[in-house]
Amino acid sequence: MSADCCFSTLLSAAQRGWLACDGDEALLSLALPIEGIDPLLALPQLAEQESLQVLWDSAPGLCLAAAGPCQELELAGSRRFEQAQRFADLCLSRLHDTAADSPAHARPRVLLRFRFFDQVSERRRSEAVVPSVQAVLPRWQLSRQGRRGWLRLNGVVSSAADCREL
């Protein structure tokens, strides 16, 4: 498939996704199948200017790279795990997936990072404090199972022009 054909397909999918939103601000998720790509090697290109960079490699053959936040929430307190789950559920329920027929490994994911102890020692109070829970729907997500890969772009859209920019 040529690059122009892929771009045209993605642009059409973005416009259909926007029309399905009925003019309301929404989370739009675009996906494109990519054969034989290694998420580890592609992560530096995805994450050039991004503060969030994640690589997850799990047997049997699933690999995921993610970069940049599309939606994020930092939490603390005793109900942080419950609130993180609620945030993940809300993000995924608001998401308009233009490639709903993609395989399970390619579907949008909310990534969670936990710190299990809520206390910060006196020595570390001056250092940058890592939140107890950080929940992120990444802007870029690249997943691969076997040789089947998918590149996904998530973004907030509030107009047809946002779809073209995405």
Predicted regions: what they are:
Residues 1-166:
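Signature of the chorismate-utilizing enzyme
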